[in-house]
Amino acid sequence: MTTPPNGPTTNAKSPAQMAPTQRNLLLFAGMAALLIMVGVLQSWNVAFSILNMCLISAIMALGVNIQWGYAGLFNVGVMGFAALGGLAGVVVSMPPVDAAWAAGGLGIIMGLATGIATLIAGMMVWRRGQSWGRWRYAATAVIVISGYILMRSLADPSVAAIEAVDPARTGYLGGLGLPIILSWLVGGVFAAAAAWVVGKVSLGLRADYLAIATLGISEIIIYVLKFEDWLSRGVKNVNGLPRPVPYEVDLQANSWFIALADTLNLPLVDASSLVVKICYALLFTVVLLAVLWLSETALRSPWGRMMRAIRDNETAANAMGKNVTKQHLLVFVLGSAVIGVAGAMMVKLDGQFTPTSYQPLRFTFLIWVMVIAGGSGNNWGAVLGGFLIWFFWIEAEPIGLWLMDVVTSGLPPTHWLRLHLLESAAHTRLMTMGVILLLVLRFSPRGLIPESRR
């Protein structure tokens, strides 16, 4: 007869010993608890503001995960594709500026048509003139230079005329005045079209050179949006973008909403702001779930298994007859389209298109931290990483201020060290991201929700 061990027995498991499903549920429950804590300790308006950007960040992280987690493509041009999504919001939803179209719309169309025709003609001559020897270079150069001169001669006077039309309020062509939700799809199309061009040029490069190429092209896209005022107002920004949810002032003017705010014992302004944020959260959740479902379906399909095989061993996949370059281009376009959708959603949440806010190095780093920390190759991991990293990106400042206030509470209020630490605490965001990344890589190198073994 065996003797029972001394002391009580326990069946509790550490998070690392849990089944993957239990562990994932625990992680998402912890994320929800963090958002609830913000609502209780700060305000629900702040909590839903963070939640909305977490949802957009999760969609953007899914786009990067499609490229890197599925195919191993190192895309550092994330902000360029997000900016194209933002441009789609302007082009689709803003009303057209009739005076600007009358002043130079025809010239812009003719200039763009000339530029496209020049590119097509140059490509055709380059491909078909392989037997021409040196004349091939000369003919291509003549076509490109003459086409460029003709394009500028048509477009430049029109650009000047458009930008002179009430530059304080417009100074650009405006948009099509279509429903705002449509811009989310168009944002994906814009980003996908740009990704196709970028992919045709750069996907033959090795990973490190591909990263440099995508970063450079992203900078070019943002540079164009900053300085082509006729298209996007440049650094003057486009304000007052339509949005798919009610405006706060409209809610505040309704008697039923006033009664609802009184019932909830909330100030009218706070209640209207909260309802608008909840509406955004519902819309963004629908989009996130749709993208997540499509991503999971693709990942579990034969195509998804083929992409993972290409990622793990390109040489073997190529030897088995798979067109690696074609599949890389496809997955690059799909991931960029998802990023473009997220970019279009972001400008609708902000209500303005600000080209200067797209900082490739800073925010591309943030999206990559989301994917790496959440779990590369796992869609649920990308979603969790999007939520977790954006939450701490926003909350790093108040947490840092509170921590420094506690640490220096024993010092006089005017002590130089206390003042210095309190002033510096607001700039701990990047350090916080680095600490989170190091902790994840140390204790869970494959991410919080790693790619499942198949």
Predicted regions: what they are:
Residues 2-454:
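Transmembrane alpha-helices and adjacent helix-loop boundaries
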